[in-house]
């Protein structure tokens, strides 16, 4: 455990270093700490011995280590003030007409990346917590059709497919009937289970050749089990991390899993400093903020950046964007669930 003065010294070094990215010496702290330069140097040496500070190669000053940043986040981090220009730009960015949920999620991800200069990712409600509330098949021609799936009565998913060659005219209706009878209204995990257990038995009753029918079921429904994730600012990872992290950002399902694992069920926000079990994220900071998607559940907004980021500003920005996002989604879903009449 460190003393109050040592904690103040660490906090000041973190603040100064994240602003200048230059090592901090005892003289720079003397006017901010009511102690002699020798006492400050002593405390800095103790903090270094504890692994919270480290020496710079080109200076006698000290800079925070990954452990030092982590200690700061866990014990001293509080929200900083938002620059008025930043706030104006954020509010202005959310003043647009959204035609679908993805428009809002993508805008939030882009704004977080643009204002921080780092990588941002945003996730919809976890697939396992969604329900299949609608299903239809629209035949486009004699050879292809479009499956329209609806999740949580508001999120559509379309899948175009070639009609199997051995299908008769009634077979699409039979397939639609099976879905309506066995899968509609069920949560996605139950749908997944039934596709593996119950549906193959049902299909045998209605189809002579079942292999291509089961393949078609898999093809139509596979999208239900994928995370909806938008990532902005991927190229920035080359500046603060490296090629491995940059390449990992393209593996969106793995990234989504890492983000979900960073936050427990009870937490509304977390800051993970060089502490991810995923090797590609092991040396970066991951900030995650949980936001409400009305009538459906919670989404996650994440910021991925360097360990030496400006935490006060970054945490404040993700909080403000999260709040603006919640307001925008509330208005969007209120409109979807209202009676809409155009009066001329």
Swiss-Prot record:
Gene Ontology terms: biological process: negative regulation of DNA-templated transcription
Protein name in UniProt: Heat-inducible transcription repressor HrcA
Entry's family note: Belongs to the HrcA family.
InterPro entries documented for this protein: GAF-like_dom_sf, HrcA, HrcA_C, WH-like_DNA-bd_sf, WH_DNA-bd_sf, WHTH_HrcA_DNA-bd, WHTH_transcript_rep_HrcA_IDD
Disulfide cross-links: none
Keywords: Repressor, Stress response, Transcription, Transcription regulation
MF terms (GO), sorted A to Z: DNA binding
Role: Negative regulator of class I heat shock genes (grpE-dnaK-dnaJ and groELS operons). Prevents heat-shock induction of these operons.
Lineage: Bacteria, Bacillati, Bacillota, Bacilli, Lactobacillales
């Amino acid at each position: 455990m460190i003393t109050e003065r040592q904690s103040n010294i660490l906090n000041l070094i973190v603040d100064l270093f994240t602003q200048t990215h230059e090592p901090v010496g005892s003289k720079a702290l003397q006017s901010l700490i009511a102690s002699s330069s020798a006492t400050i140097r002593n405390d800095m040496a103790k903090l270094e011995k504890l692994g919270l500070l480290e020496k710079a190669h080109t200076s006698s000053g000290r800079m925070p280590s990954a452990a030092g940043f982590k200690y700061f986040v866990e014990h001293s981090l509080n929200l900083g003030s938002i620059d008025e220009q930043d706030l104006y730009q954020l509010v202005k960015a959310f003043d647009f007409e959204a035609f679908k949920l993805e428009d809002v999620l993508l805008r939030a991800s882009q704004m977080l990346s643009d204002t921080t200069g780092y990588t941002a990712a945003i996730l919809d409600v976890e697939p396992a917590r969604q329900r299949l509330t609608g299903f239809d098949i629209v035949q486009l021609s004699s050879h292809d059709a479009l499956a329209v799936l609806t999740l949580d009565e508001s999120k559509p998913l379309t899948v175009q497919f070639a009609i199997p060659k051995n299908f008769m005219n009634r077979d699409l209706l039979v397939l639609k009937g099976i879905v309506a009878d066995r899968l509609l209204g069920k949560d996605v995990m139950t749908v997944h289970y039934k596709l593996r257990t119950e549906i193959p038995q049902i299909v045998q009753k209605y189809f002579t050749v079942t292999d291509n029918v089961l393949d078609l079921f898999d093809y139509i429904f596979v999208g239900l089990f994928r995370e909806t994730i938008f990532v902005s600012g991927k190229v920035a990872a080359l500046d603060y991390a490296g090629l491995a992290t940059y390449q990992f950002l393209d593996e969106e399902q793995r990234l989504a899993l890492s983000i979900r694992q960073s936050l427990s069920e009870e937490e509304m926000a977390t800051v993970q400093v060089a502490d991810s079990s995923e090797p590609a994220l092991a040396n970066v900071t991951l900030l995650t903020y949980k936001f409400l998607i009305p009538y459906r559940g919670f989404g996650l907004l994440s910021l991925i950046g360097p360990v030496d980021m400006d935490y006060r500003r970054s945490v404040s920005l993700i909080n403000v964007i999260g709040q603006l996002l919640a307001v925008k989604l509330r208005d969007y879903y209120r409109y979807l669930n209202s009676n809409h009449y155009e009066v001329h």
